[in-house]
């Protein structure tokens, strides 16, 4: 499949603009223009702090954040997708941890470790999530898609993981005795609704302009 750009297909930029203006004037929302397949953003942040409380106790803190998104666009020789029919696939991950190591004596050491990781994944139309999905079966000889993809109109996943570990180590002669505790908890939120704001099909551009849909579903 191609990128869906107007200069790679039979449809012209003027025709794309005409469909766009019809949609704005008749339906009150902007399907945007020609989609780009190269738009992406990435941002990373990290922090580490080592702190010596005293000669027997040491604390280490780590934090890392990664956030990015990429525009996913479609297209073919017989189909044209407006930018609103593409989607941003975004993901943000925050991870933090803290470790406390304590030397209680020459023979006894304790470690307490806690970490939290949260990940939010989204798939959103550049036009926003409150726009319908339109497709026109024949507009200038092509099938044209506008608005939020029916599988991206409400698509979100959020996960959070908490991990706690406590460990006690005792050295006696040639032996090492350990005792510990570990616990992991998960919290998951998943939202998925097909065609949240409706799906309209139009047989032709004239029907689209006349607001005459051949089918409608929600």
Go through each PLM region and give its residues.
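Surface-exposed beta-strand-turn/loop segments characteristic
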Residues: 1-41
């Amino acid at each position: 499949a191609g990128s869906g750009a107007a200069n790679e297909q039979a449809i012209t930029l003027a025709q794309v603009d005409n469909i766009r203006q019809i949609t704005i004037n008749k339906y009150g929302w902007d399907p945007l223009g020609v989609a780009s397949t190269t738009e992406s953003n990435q941002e990373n942040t990290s922090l580490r702090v080592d702190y010596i409380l005293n000669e027997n106790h040491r604390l280490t803190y780590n934090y890392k954040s990664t956030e990015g998104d990429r525009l996913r666009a479609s297209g073919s020789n017989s189909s044209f997708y407006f930018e609103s029919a593409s989607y941003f696939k975004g993901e943000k991950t925050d991870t933090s941890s803290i470790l406390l190591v304590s030397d209680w004596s020459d023979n006894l050491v304790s470690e307490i470790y806690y970490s939290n990781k949260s990940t939010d994944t989204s798939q959103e139309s550049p036009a926003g999530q409150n726009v319908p999905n339109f497709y026109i079966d024949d507009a200038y000889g092509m099938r044209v898609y506008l608005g939020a993809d029916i599988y991206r109109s409400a698509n979100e996943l959020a996960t959070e993981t908490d991990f706690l570990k406590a460990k006690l180590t005792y050295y006696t002669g040639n032996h090492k005795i350990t005792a510990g505790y570990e616990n992991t908890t998960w919290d998951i939120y998943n939202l998925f609704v097909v065609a949240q704001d409706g799906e309209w099909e139009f047989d032709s551009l004239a029907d689209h302009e006349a607001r005459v849909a051949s089918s409608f579903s929600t």
